[in-house]
């Protein structure tokens, strides 16, 4: 629910990754293609799509060198551009459909591209680094094809492909959703974090703690927290491991069974053949596919196990802020998920081993984990914990990369006209933000066809979007309602001018 449904035909969605620095000479054009979906299109078709995209990028750079092409609206398609790395471009082409459900916001689609790239870098390193490591492009293709394909599987429900639609306008991909803690619970969490950070002796670890699909604590930077949070909600939390789909989690989970043909994960013969070194440092030639479904399970000791990295191998990730590699250990107790990051350098140097770290967690943190889970469960208000009667809202803190929103079940009660008006409102805000290229305070109010007020307020990096369906309200009544919400739930972060 809430995602624009698209058929699985090749016209519905095309997604490509290409390098502008490659394939500049005649006969070498295929070298620039690093990924293309669907992969069974002819090379001439793929080159045609990428050639058009490259031309648009080159042309728009003449007028805006610092910010090239972002979106092109054609009669039948929308072309969404994202420069993931210098001269490494991702382009999504979506078919325009007369069905009302196929109404989307361009920034929401671009956030899909940004998310899949960020997750890829977290597990495999940057695309440019892989190209420098193996210049033919075979290495990076061998990782991009299965990784993005596994990610796209989450956009399938049955045989229908789903993209973020106007029904998702009160959600914000690329942010984390946090659990509000009472003071006593916060103190218990702080104590637990201290124990986790010291589980590797003198080597400092990092930790991320989740309760259900909400963030409780993190010692990572906001960007790294967003990436690890997204992956945790997709594959690691209790909701992700269960067969059912969480109805209130922001990230929509796929059906659990691959819907994209297996040939989509096979690398087209563009690069060199033969066994390739792994992008994450493995010399076995194994292609790591961390986004595969049903590959994680809970062991007897409470730690999650997987064979994705190989039998008895420990998962690894790369942290953006420090460019440091870590082992990823995940411990689970009831609805509490603890992700512990241990520096690989410490293990390689023989200072400790993974089994020792796990034992330290079990011996030193078990009691604190039980206490934290108990306190969080007692204070937990359930799926509708952040529902505010009479309001349907989205609150975003761009500096902290945190968001909070009305529960999906409550948002679903809004009329279609209200959601469409909200989507249009957010598009106007996106346009203003892109035009100014800097933080801008503003307020926009729109009255929908069904007399619903939809309102946006932006102030000092924070954004508030709201729908008020009381048809009798005047503009003054609506703005007063927003102000009351701001004062009570946002610490007055959105004052009236």
UniProtKB/Swiss-Prot annotation:
Major site of localization recorded for this protein: other
Family, as annotated: Belongs to the CCZ1 family.
Alphabetical UniProt keywords: Endosome, Guanine-nucleotide releasing factor
UniProt subcellular location: Endosome; Prevacuolar compartment
Domain of life of the source: Eukaryota
InterPro entries per record: Ccz1, CCZ1/INTU/HSP4_longin_1
Gene behind the chain: CCZ1B
Physiological role: Plays an important role in membrane trafficking through the secretory apparatus. In complex with MON1, acts as a guanine exchange factor (GEF) for RABG3F of the RAB7 protein family. Promotes the exchange of GDP to GTP, converting RABG3F from an inactive GDP-bound form into an active GTP-bound form. The RABG3F active form is involved in protein trafficking from prevacuolar compartments (PVCs) to vacuoles. May serve as a linker between Rab5 and Rab7 protein families in PVCs and mediate PVC maturation.
Pfam families linked to this entry: Intu_longin_1
GO biological process: vesicle-mediated transport
Subunit field text: Interacts with MON1.
GO molecular function, one term: guanyl-nucleotide exchange factor activity
Any one of the GO CC terms: Mon1-Ccz1 complex
Name under which the protein is recorded: Vacuolar fusion protein CCZ1 homolog B
Ranges for region Disordered: 244-284
């Amino acid at each position: 629910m809430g995602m624009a449904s698209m058929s699985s035909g090749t016209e519905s969605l095309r997604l490509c990754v290409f390098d502008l620095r490659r394939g500049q000479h005649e006969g070498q054009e295929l070298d620039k293609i690093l990924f293309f979906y669907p992969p069974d299109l002819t090379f001439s078709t793929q080159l045609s799509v990428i050639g058009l995209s490259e031309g648009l990028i080159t042309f728009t750079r003449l007028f805006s060198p610092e910010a090239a092409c972002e979106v092109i609206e054609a009669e039948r398609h929308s072309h969404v551009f994202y420069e993931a790395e210098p001269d490494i471009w991702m382009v999504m082409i979506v078919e325009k459909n007369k069905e009302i459900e196929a109404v989307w916001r361009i920034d929401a689609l671009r956030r899909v591209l940004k998310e899949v790239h960020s997750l890829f870098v977290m597990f495999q390193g940057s695309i440019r680094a892989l190209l420098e490591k193996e210049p033919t492009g075979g290495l990076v293709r061998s990782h991009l094809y299965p990784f993005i394909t596994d990610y796209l599987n989450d956009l399938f429900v049955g045989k229908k492909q789903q993209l973020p639609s106007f029904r998702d306008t009160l959600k914000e991909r690329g942010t984390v959703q946090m659990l509000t803690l009472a003071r006593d619970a916060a103190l218990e969490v702080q104590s637990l974090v201290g124990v986790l950070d010291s589980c590797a002796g003198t080597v400092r670890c990092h930790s991320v703690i989740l309760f259900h699909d909400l963030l409780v604590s993190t010692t990572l930077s906001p960007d790294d927290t967003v990436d690890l949070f997204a992956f945790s909600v997709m594959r690691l939390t209790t909701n992700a491991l269960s067969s059912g789909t969480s109805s209130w989690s922001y990230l929509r989970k796929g059906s659990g069974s691959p819907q994209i043909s297996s040939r989509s994960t096979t690398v087209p013969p563009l690069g060199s053949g033969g066994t390739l070194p792994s992008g994450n440092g493995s010399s076995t030639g194994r292609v790591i596919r961390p986004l595969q479904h049903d590959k994680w399970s809970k062991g007897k000791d409470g730690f999650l196990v997987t064979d994705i990295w190989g039998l008895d191998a420990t998962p690894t990730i790369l942290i953006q802020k420090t460019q440091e590699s870590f082992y990823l250990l995940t411990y689970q107790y009831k609805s509490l998920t603890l992700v512990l990051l241990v520096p690989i350098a410490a293990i390689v140097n023989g200072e400790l081993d993974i089994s020792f770290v796990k034992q330290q967690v079990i011996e030193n943190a078990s009691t604190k984990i039980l206490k934290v889970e108990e306190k969080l469960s007692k204070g937990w208000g359930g799926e509708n914990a952040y529902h505010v009667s009479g309001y349907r809202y989205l609150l975003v803190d761009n500096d902290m990369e945190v968001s909070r929103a009305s529960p999906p079940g409550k948002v679903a009660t809004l009329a279609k006209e209200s959601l469409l008006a909200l989507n249009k409102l957010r598009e106007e805000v996106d346009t203003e933000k892109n035009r100014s290229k800097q933080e801008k305070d503003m307020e926009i109010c729109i009255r929908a066809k069904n007399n619903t007020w939809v309102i946006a307020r932006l102030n000092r990096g924070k954004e508030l979007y709201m729908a008020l369906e009381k048809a009798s309200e005047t503009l003054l009544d609506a703005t007063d309602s927003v102000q009351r919400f701001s004062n009570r739930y946002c610490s007055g972060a959105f004052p009236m001018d």
